[in-house]
Amino acid sequence: MTNPLSFTLWFPLLGAIAIALIPRRQVDLTKMAALVISLVTFGASLMILQSFRDGEPGFQLTTSVPWIPQWGITYTIGVDGISLWLVLLTTLLTPVVILSSWNSIHKHMKGYVVAMLVLEFAMIGAFVALDLLLFYIFFELMLIPMYLIIGVWGGTNRIYAAIKFFIFTIAGSLLMLLGIIYLVFLGYHSQPGSPSFAITDLYAMSVPMHAQVFLFFAFALAFAIKVPLFPLHTWLPDAHVEAPTGGSIILAGVMLKMGTYGFLRFVLPFFPQASARYAVLFGVLSVIGIIYGALVAWVQPDMKKLVAYSSVSHLGFCVLGIFAMNQTSIEGAILQMVNHGLSTGALFLLVGVIYERRHTRLLADFGGLARTMPLFTVFFIIAALSSIGLPGLNGFVGEFLILSGTFRSHPVLATLATTGVILSALYMLWMVQKVFFGPVTNPENEAIKDVAWNEVVAVVPLIVMMVWIGVHPSTFLKKMEPSVQQLLATVNSRRDEPRVLTTSNPASPAVVRSAGFQPAVSLASSRPRLLSPEAGRMPAVRPAGSRRSETAGASR
């Protein structure tokens, strides 16, 4: 595989198969093999970053192989500025998870790391899939290893939490499958030829408004459950509390981003008119989730549950930024997805460190840990300040962009969402004060050991990334900017189209150009910029036998 994207996708799965052949008693070999495989995958993802060309809005490093050509189904993958950082976040957190589980998983270690590597494969696949059915397969595949991670290696109520997680997510996914079939059916009957599941073909298809409303909610419900967006969040606290530390890290760090990513990749460009109609509804639900999650987090006696409810609040900011539907807010939402993965992943890791030593997560059982665990205290406070959004750390940049962009389109919602920032400072600082400061009142906290080598190696990269994004966010923003501009050009060029079903509307040539990855001017950008023709000339990736490939080619 000369394409680093293909290698990054398939190597974890091949590694999982190889580890499955290791004898069960070779625990040390199993752990070391899993760590090496995850590190090699991360190294390959850095090659993706190196190969990624700035200024090009289209998908890069694409691979397309016909799979079921009669139905226009292909194995097509690629990466753009929206998915690039999420792929890197996935490959970064996987070795962190394996290191954090080095001494904490005491049964079926081989099964645990195999499940983690299969989960990594599925998550990367969902981020890079450019065929809608292929995306759905990866989206569903993620459920199986995460269900096992919670149900086998979780806490006392792990079976209940695993089943609740599975039922919530599969219910939304089945509705999305119905929406996928209906969407492709509409395209098939709009023009003679073979159907197509290619995302680029579906971008170029205008859907009548009555169909858009159903399809919008079919897709949006599946992604809202995954975020999770209030009031569909009730599965998340149980899953986090019962999951092992590694499961919580990967669930909060990556899996929840499938929901916000789905809104950006599918909901907005597929159904722009319905998205505009219901943007305020999703903005209101986001603000309710921001405030509700923060208030409930503030009263939690359990550290892990506190961090879990903080995810409901923080990811509400991401959904708010997405449905503000301008360049500033969407760039902030993408960056905040990465920020949340780093800061909340670090917090779950560090809560797991305490739990392994004291076998309790209750705030009342701690106090004065700054004296007995000084290095751990430094790590935890940095992660907490990052979650709060302290200037100089990553959380500030994402929240600032989201609120700035939202204020332009929905000033009332932006003002209300600002209270979530204040509340997050209150509950995070309250937790820090209860755990780390004051006298050591519990004798069991006197002899508690500071962080071990594997815990230091796991958390330091996350801390470094928090500081890097906070100090130099342009490194990340400049790679996503052209793709965000193109997304908004696609959405805005279709919001005022006649509400009839067509696959090549002459009134909106920007749609076809955007589907073919030709550069376009962002109509909603707060920083409008005309991309040069040379900057974004990427050929559209189209399945064999696609009925729209000639149309798109003629448009180009």
Where are the regions a protein language model picked out?
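C-terminal ends of transmembrane helices
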Residues: 16-27, 94-106, 148-157, 226-241, ...
